[in-house]
Amino acid sequence: MPVADTSQLISGVAERYASSLFELALDAGSIEAVGADLTRIQALIDGSDDLKRLIVSPVFSADDQFKAISALVEKFGFSGLVGNFLKVVARNRRLFVLPGIIKAFRLLAARHKGEITADVTSAHALTLAQEIELKAALKGVTGKDVAVNVTVDPSILGGLIVKVGSRQIDTSLRTKLSTLKLALKEVG
């Protein structure tokens, strides 16, 4: 199966699971709480190489994944809806799509609230004040409330890469250095 087909399959699975979770959260009136729990889960995944391995590796059995996720749910006190959802995902051997599920859920929640989503890549974690300022600037440009998904990528060296819909603004130091390098090659 070509890589493009595989990523579309994973994306489709993630969207179906996210849609199911969103509908349950909507019925329970807990979209915000579920979103907060999913943000905590994403932070746990980003902060733990062991958890990343558990999620993506086919070496772990469904039972091992279920036990680990159950322990995680208990330790961090995730809500009943999110806790049960994580256990179902683990039982069905779909933990590898969990980051995609989280992203798809955020998109559904933002759409429900009339927000648009901006994917922001930064060399360093943004402070709360920086995130608020960025949201305000993006709202001024788009005219809509903006939910920001921040990804830290030290390889961009500095600056930001902001994607809103089909538009991308790249003010990263890496891109500026690449542009300068090309300009110097043309001169010399």
Swiss-Prot record:
Membrane topology according to the record: Peripheral membrane protein
Record's GO cellular component terms: plasma membrane; proton-transporting ATP synthase complex
Signal listed as a keyword: no
Predominant cellular place of this UniProt entry's protein: membrane
Database matches in InterPro entries: ATP_synth_OSCP/delta_N_sf, ATPase_OSCP/d_CS, ATPase_OSCP/dsu
Location(s) in or outside the cell: Cell inner membrane
SUPFAM superfamilies noted in UniProt: N-terminal domain of the delta subunit of the F1F0-ATP synthase (SSF47928)
A Pfam family of this chain: OSCP
Alphabetical UniProt keywords: ATP synthesis, Cell inner membrane, Cell membrane, CF(1), Hydrogen ion transport, Ion transport, Membrane, Transport
Gene Ontology terms, MF aspect: proton-transporting ATP synthase activity, rotational mechanism
Domain of life: Bacteria
UniProt keyword Lipid metabolism, yes or no: no
Gene3D superfamilies according to UniProt: N-terminal domain of the delta subunit of the F1F0-ATP synthase (1.10.520.20)
Family according to the record: Belongs to the ATPase delta chain family.
Subunit field text: F-type ATPases have 2 components, F(1) - the catalytic core - and F(0) - the membrane proton channel. F(1) has five subunits: alpha(3), beta(3), gamma(1), delta(1), epsilon(1). F(0) has three main subunits: a(1), b(2) and c(10-14). The alpha and beta chains form an alternating ring which encloses part of the gamma chain. F(1) is attached to F(0) by a central stalk formed by the gamma and epsilon chains, while a peripheral stalk is formed by the delta and b chains.
Function: F(1)F(0) ATP synthase produces ATP from ADP in the presence of a proton or sodium gradient. F-type ATPases consist of two structural domains, F(1) containing the extramembraneous catalytic core and F(0) containing the membrane proton channel, linked together by a central stalk and a peripheral stalk. During catalysis, ATP synthesis in the catalytic domain of F(1) is coupled via a rotary mechanism of the central stalk subunits to proton translocation.
NCBIfam families attached to this UniProt entry: ATP_synt_delta, PRK05758.3-2
Protein name: ATP synthase subunit delta
Organism: Rhizobium meliloti (strain 1021)
Organism lineage string: Bacteria, Pseudomonadati, Pseudomonadota, Alphaproteobacteria, Hyphomicrobiales
Gene: atpH
